[in-house]
Design a protein with these regions (language model features):
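Boundary at the C-terminal end of the N-terminal hydrophobic targeting segment
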Residues: 32-36
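Short pre-active-site segment immediately N-terminal to redox-active cysteine/selenocysteine motifs
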Residues: 72-75, 83, 151
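N-terminal secretory signal peptides that target proteins for export/translocation
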Residues: 1-15
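Electrostatic cytochrome c docking/interface patches
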Residues: 37-71, 167-169
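Extracytoplasmic/secreted proteins, especially bacterial periplasmic and envelope-associated proteins
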Residues: 60, 64-67, 96, 104, ...
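C-terminal capping alpha-helices of c-type cytochrome domains
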Residues: 107, 111-112, 118, 129-169
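Bacterial N-terminal signal peptides
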Residues: 17-30
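Gly/Gly-Pro-rich "capping" loops immediately C-terminal to redox-active cysteine motifs
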Residues: 55, 77, 81-115, 124-138
Length: 169
């Protein structure tokens, strides 16, 4: 499909060769990523203690990420304290999220959210974007990650804003 699209662009647009090459070089990786991200779980590569590239090449949204952290879908506040004062309950099982952007890189945070077990085999944090090897999953949830690739990137975008001290204790 990408080859046909490229041939169409070349034949139907009088763009100078070097410029067209640059355009295709910029667009082609996105098309490849889109093809790889058709399933429920995005492919990823763990390198240097993290997932260096955003899942599916997506850019997260801070507001949606904050809503996921505060809401029941992400349920992060069950274990972590975060600067979300409108929520009465903040857990203390996991480390506080205040200042997490100073302690962890985007790549480390991404792996922590996708599959924390790869960083710490004894963690109680669930894998939010893995489906293989899980037990005790409700039949209607088998094969479906807790968060989509886009939602993971939204959470990461929000966590990267948390570089300050706690708003409350």
């Amino acid at each position: 499909m990408l080859k046909l699209w490229a041939e169409y662009v070349i034949l139907s647009n009088p763009v100078p060769g070097p410029l067209l090459g640059l355009i295709l070089a910029i667009l082609a990786p996105g098309a490849v990523l889109a093809q790889q991200c058709k399933g429920p779980v995005a492919p990823f590569l763990v390198q240097d203690g993290g997932i260096q590239a955003p899942l599916c090449g997506l850019i997260g949204d801070v507001g949606r990420g904050r809503a996921l952290v505060a809401g029941r879908q992400g349920n992060c506040l069950a274990c972590h304290a975060a600067p979300i004062p409108e929520q009465a309950f903040h857990g203390d099982i996991g480390p506080p999220l205040h200042g997490v952007a100073r302690r962890r890189s985007a790549a480390e945070l991404r792996l922590q959210v996708v599959d924390a077990g790869q960083l710490n085999a004894r963690t109680v944090m669930p894998p939010f974007h893995r489906v293989a090897g899980l037990t005790g999953v409700r039949p209607d949830r088998i094969g479906h990650p807790l968060l989509t690739a886009a939602e993971v990137e939204d959470v990461i975008a929000y966590l990267l804003t948390l570089d300050g001290k706690p708003a409350r204790q």
